[in-house]
Structures are given as structure tokens and as C-alpha cells.
Amino acid sequence: MKILAIESSCDEFSISIIDDGKILTNIISSQIDQHVNFGGVVPELAARLHLENISWVIKSALESSNTKIEEIDHVAYTEKPGLIGSLIIGKLVAETIASYIDKPLMPLHHIEGHIYGASIENEFVYPVLAMVVSGGHTQIEIVNSPNEFEVIGATLDDAIGECYDKVARVMGLGYPGGPKIDKLAQKGNKEAFIFPISKNDDSYDFSYSGLKTAVINIIHNLTQKGEEIPVADIAASFQYAATKIVEKKLEKAIIQFKPKTLTVAGGVSANSEIRNIIMSLGKKYNITNTFVPKMEYCTDNAAMIAKLAYEKLKSSN
């Protein structure tokens, strides 16, 4: 069973082909260089660049997987959530291909895809406890099957990735800010500044607006005083506060729900501290199936959509 999957929810246009659970190809057209000067993704530009990249991405996916379009059995695409213009482009491409080869169309959820990106090389044993961390989402999900997802907690304001990017912008690090802060944090003292660990309560919800404001205020105060900004120390202290609450909420969820698989998903799953937290908690609570996605599957890609589609189809047979 061959599935062609399309991911276009933001500034990546990606096509992947999977054959009976094995990824044959995962072509990604990234637009980071085009958006960096704007300090973030420009929706109209993202959609226009998707249009320009469709042809070569499709051609590359078919050629690199040695697949003829007629050999595809199902066509999957990201339906939501995301930038509306970018999503429409992906949907139209998927509908066109499915109509041309007369094969079923599968609209899928972007976040569910991210979670299954972690299962590309590691099979899930249910129930799965998944920590979703990205530019648009920060949430904890219980996954009981490819068709059963329960969000037990989510951010009430800023997502963790959004917070990283905004702090990085004020620090003058540019976009995308997450990897740059993570790298700087390795050189800094996490105890140099005491930033608030927000939403430190019994719920599974998150809040990052207070942390973001606290860091920005420190930077502005130092700037107004004409003092040097210790970027490494600020990065380390910020990262500690941003990730410590993830550790606390996840540990509470592990104790309550007793998952058989522990994983993390989304663009911020590439963060070194987040990855360390996942592996440490898995070891502490003897969760044998504890894993983080390969770096290539952390950010948006169609392989994760292809794997989700495959698992859904397999579960229905």
C-alpha cells in the first residue's frame, strides 16, 4: 500500500511517499531564508512560494522513490490547523492528484501528524503520552489509537515556540530563534536570572506570556541602564523556566495516566533540554518505549502525515 502525503500548513511544502509503513522519500521545500528578514513567517509569501515549488517537489518525490503516480493507493494531506492560504494550496494539490489517479483522499490533522512523526522509526505501544511543543501549540495528549486523541492540557496564551521566537527577537538573535537560544543556553548560567515558572499549578495547562514579558523587561531594563546584556545567561535562565514547567506537567501526567509510550512532537522537540527531559522521565518511571523523533522529523514534513495515514488505514483493516 503506497500513500502520497502532502504537508503545507506553514512555510514548508513537503511531499512524502510511504510503502507499507516504510518511508520511501520525504522531500521538503523550506522557506526559512525567504522569511528571515521579516522576523517570522509572512502568510501571503508562504502561499505564493508553495505555488512556485509544487512541480519540482512532486517530481522529486516520485523520482527519488522510483514511483509512478499511478502506483499510489491513497493521497493524504494536512487539512488543519495552519495558515489558510498554505493549507488551501496543499488541499488543491492533493485533490488534483487524487482525482487524476482516482484514489481515496485523506484529510488529516497537523498535530496528530507531528505525534506520529515520532513513530516513524519507533512503533507506539498504547496508551501514548505525547508532549506537543511547537510555534503554535503547547499541549499534552493521550493517544489510545491512531483515531483516538485526547488533549488533557494546552497553553492558555503563547505557545512555547512562539515565546522562544519573541524572546530571541528582542535579544537580537533573529528568526527562527529557538535553535539560537538553545545553543546559547549551553554556554550560560541558568541561575543567573530567576524567571517565573508560569502556570505552576495542578492543571495540565500552560502559560508563557508572563515568562515572555519578564525576559523582555529584563532586557529592556539592562538596555536603558546602558549595561551589557549577558545573552548566554539570559538564554540559559529563560530556557530553564520554559522547560521546567514542561517537566513538572509531564511527570504529573505520567503518574496519573501510566503511559506505555512517552514521546515528544513538534518543532521545539528539537530542543536539547526538552529531549533530555523526555528521556530522563522515561528512565525515571521505567517507560521502556520512550523516544524522541529524529531531527529531520521534528519540523514540518510530509513523512509524519504519511505515517499517520498509514496507521489510520492499518487500524481500520
From Swiss-Prot:
It comes from Mesoplasma florum (strain ATCC 33453 / NBRC 100688 / NCTC 11704 / L1) (Acholeplasma florum). Substrate binds at residues 132-136, 165, 178, 182, 271. One of its GO terms (cellular component) is cytoplasm. Its main location: cytoplasm. GO terms for biological process: tRNA threonylcarbamoyladenosine modification. GO terms for molecular function: iron ion binding; N(6)-L-threonylcarbamoyladenine synthase activity. Required for the formation of a threonylcarbamoyl group on adenosine at position 37 (t(6)A37) in tRNAs that read codons beginning with adenine. Is involved in the transfer of the threonylcarbamoyl moiety of threonylcarbamoyl-AMP (TC-AMP) to the N6 group of A37, together with TsaE and TsaB. TsaD likely plays a direct catalytic role in this reaction. This is tRNA N6-adenosine threonylcarbamoyltransferase. It is found in: Cytoplasm. The gene is tsaD. The keyword Acyltransferase applies. It catalyses: L-threonylcarbamoyladenylate + adenosine(37) in tRNA = N(6)-L-threonylcarbamoyladenosine(37) in tRNA + AMP + H(+). Fe cation binds at residues 110, 114, 300. Its EC number is 2.3.1.234. CDD domains: ASKHA_NBD_TsaD_bac (cd24133). Pfam families: TsaD (PF00814). Belongs to the KAE1 / TsaD family. Its cofactor is Fe(2+). Binds 1 Fe(2+) ion per subunit. The keyword Cytoplasm applies. Keywords: Acyltransferase, Cytoplasm, Iron, Metal-binding, Transferase, tRNA processing. HAMAP family: TsaD.
